[in-house]
Design a protein with these regions (language model features):
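Outer-membrane beta-barrel signature, preferentially recognizing the C-terminal barrel domain
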Residues: 1-29, 46-58, 67, 183-186
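Transmembrane beta-strands of outer-membrane beta-barrel pores
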Residues: 8, 16-18, 25-29, 66, ...
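Transmembrane beta-strands of outer-membrane beta-barrel proteins
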Residues: 10, 19-23, 72-78, 97-101, ...
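Residues on the lipid-exposed face of transmembrane beta-strands in outer-membrane beta-barrel proteins
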Residues: 10-16, 60-66, 101-105, 140-144, ...
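Outer-membrane beta-barrel translocator domains and adjoining extracellular loop/strand segments
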Residues: 25-27, 31-40, 77, 85-93, ...
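Gram-negative outer-membrane beta-barrel transporters
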Residues: 26-29, 45-47, 51-120
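C-terminal beta-barrel architecture of Gram-negative outer-membrane proteins
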Residues: 80-85, 99-146, 156-162, 170, ...
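C-terminal beta-signal and adjacent terminal beta-strands/loops
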Residues: 146-211
Length: 211
């Protein structure tokens, strides 16, 4: 029978101008994890179930988001996670790094271009026994507005280099399960949004918008 989880977390945040540091240490009592196991009377039959597992993890992140030359807004994020999880004398403790770099250039009040690039190293998550393989992603977009920002066009290209995949593995009780999802192909997308006239509520005086 599953027990309710209990989490104790300590977080420290330091910020100075455009720079921010965040560190977290957490312990989870009776956390919920997904486990593969053998059927009691037949080892050739395996099944998937949830179990309570105690775990701990540490997380450190640094964020830098300045405004340069009045129009360029880069944002850099570096994140490190170290889990501490064990089950049946097997450890699931491999740490992982996450890097993200965003760029937004405001060419005018009505025209912006930007990109997002991120990369994740292989490692275990902080909340389960799943092992994720390395993954990278890149996106490019431009936004143009008309009619005092009422009409908005957003043209984007997602997964530019076709490198983003969902690939992970669960290895418990001698049973290995792999998943490789290759459906996230490069995509060209155009989104058009129109915002209608704002009308004020006669009760609270707040503006409401229909899109």
């Amino acid at each position: 029978e599953l027990q309710p989880s209990k989490t104790n977390m300590l977080t420290l945040t330091l910020a100075w101008k455009d720079l921010q540091f965040i560190s977290t240490y957490a312990t989870v009592k009776d956390g919920i994890s997904y486990i593969y196991d053998h059927y009691e009377t037949n080892d050739s039959i395996s099944f998937f179930q949830t179990r309570n597992l105690d775990r701990r993890y540490m997380n450190f992140s640094a964020n830098y988001s300045p405004t340069l030359f009045k129009i360029w807004k880069p944002a850099l994020q570096v994140n490190f996670t170290k889990p501490f999880i064990s089950y049946n004398n097997q450890k699931y403790n491999k740490p992982n790094w996450y890097f993200e770099m965003d760029h937004l250039i405001e060419l005018s009040k009505s025209f912006n271009v930007g990109c997002e690039i991120d990369y994740t190293t292989a490692g275990h998550t902080d909340n389960d026994v799943i092992y994720y393989f390395a993954n990278s992603y890149a996106e490019l977009y431009c936004i143009k507005t008309f009619l005092n920002n009422r009409l908005r066009f957003n043209l984007s290209v997602t997964n530019i280099f076709n490198t983003s995949r969902e690939k992970w593995q669960i290895n418990t009780n001698g049973i290995i399960s792999n998943k490789w999802n290759d459906n996230n192909k490069r995509t060209f997308k155009l989104t058009v949004t129109y915002r209608f006239n704002e009308s004020k509520s006669k009760y609270k005086g707040t503006a409401s918008t229909d899109e």
